[in-house]
A protein has these predicted regions:
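Short, well-ordered beta-strand elements
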Residues: 23-38, 56-61, 150-154, 276
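A conserved helix-loop-strand patch within extracytoplasmic ligand-binding domains
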Residues: 101-155
Length: 331
């Protein structure tokens, strides 16, 4: 604790980058520090390991999914986006990979991004709730609706793409006819607050959430089985659309989350590229670190040092032994 302060894409994984193009030296690297916590944490972990372990000069640049991808694709910078959610940029990313401008270095989240409908684990175990159908049979267990005679299904914040998806899942499951009301959480903070409030009151909660996130690191939640396979055609033509004429429940698609680099970086970065190709972690690991960030009001840099001190068993496998020793000496 020394410092507290897509199929086309997969075909072009970095394992196929020619070895002769790489150099043994590291040089100067730019990394996107994306504007959500898990990606910001990853950027700082990369920065510390590359600087302290490999002697690179690393600069962080502010980023977000689409602006960062566009800049990498059109300008060749920054060199590296640690956490790129592929579903958000799938078509242009596939094209950029196919045309040789972007290389997928690794799958940073081994579980992928996970979305779904969740309930508290204690409630699921106490009442035998495993599926969405099980939960919808008990509106009395889920307070929070404006109409107190109904159960609450907490949906996505206003303006988010998942708002329409949740509405259609709500309608497709006939939740309204089963005594539920779809609650507009208004904002991410309000959605988080509804989960925290239910936990503090030992009350039930049902609604949309995703991982990795701090909330799922703080509270033990169970993702419900929707008992419906993912249907790509139904998803694309109806579920994602606000005017879906015939909503039917379908499972959320898996969200591939990759580290992407520019082709120039892949060819010239040498040891840095070797490192990036090996680096990945689980949602449980990230959930725990994000929860620590919230509980300690820590920033990305603080959390990166905490991760390196707490989880040597994870990151030491990403690097050679001599590099690991250099990183440990810097903590």
């Amino acid at each position: 604790m020394g410092r507290f302060l897509a199929s086309t894409t997969l075909a072009f994984f970095a394992a196929g980058v020619p070895a002769f193009a790489a150099e043994d030296t590291c040089g100067t690297i730019t990394i996107a520090e994306m504007n959500w916590a898990s990606a910001g944490l990853a950027a700082w972990v990369d920065k510390i390991i590359l600087e302290e372990g490999y002697g690179c000069e690393v600069g962080l640049v502010a980023g977000d999914t689409m602006p960062t991808f566009t800049s990498m694709n059109e300008k060749g910078e920054p060199d590296l986006a640690p956490e790129l959610w592929v579903n958000a940029v799938k078509e242009p990313l596939d094209q950029a990979v196919a045309e040789g401008r972007i290389v997928i270095a690794s799958q940073i989240l081994t579980d992928g991004g996970v979305e779904g409908i969740w309930v508290p684990t204690w409630l699921a175990e106490e009442h035998g709730i495993r599926t969405l159908k099980d939960a919808l049979a008990h509106p009395e267990l889920f307070p929070g609706a404006e109409d107190e005679s109904k159960g609450a299904w907490f949906g996505c914040p206003s303006g988010w793409a998942c708002q329409a998806i949740n509405r259609n899942q709500f309608l497709g499951s006939d939740a309204d006819e089963k005594g539920f009301e779809l609650v507009d959480s208004g904002s991410a903070a309000a959605l988080d607050g509804s989960i925290a409030r239910a936990a503090n009151r030992n009350e039930g909660w049902l609604g949309y959430y995703w991982a990795p996130t701090a909330i799922l690191g703080q509270y033990d939640m169970t993702r419900l089985d929707l008992e419906a396979e993912f249907d790509r055609e139904r998803w694309d033509t109806c579920i994602v659309k606000p005017d879906c004429a015939d909503p039917q429940v379908t499972e959320w698609p898996a969200s591939d989350v990759y580290t992407a680099v520019t082709s120039e970086f892949a060819q010239k970065a040498g040891v840095a590229m070797d490192y990036v190709k090996t680096r990945s972690w689980s949602n449980d690991t990230v959930n725990g670190m994000l929860a620590w960030m919230v509980e300690n009001q820590a920033n990305n840099e603080d959390a990166a040092y905490e991760f390196l001190e707490r989880h040597e068993e994870i990151w030491a496998d990403w690097v050679p032994a001599d590099v690991a020793e250099k990183v440990k000496a810097a903590l």
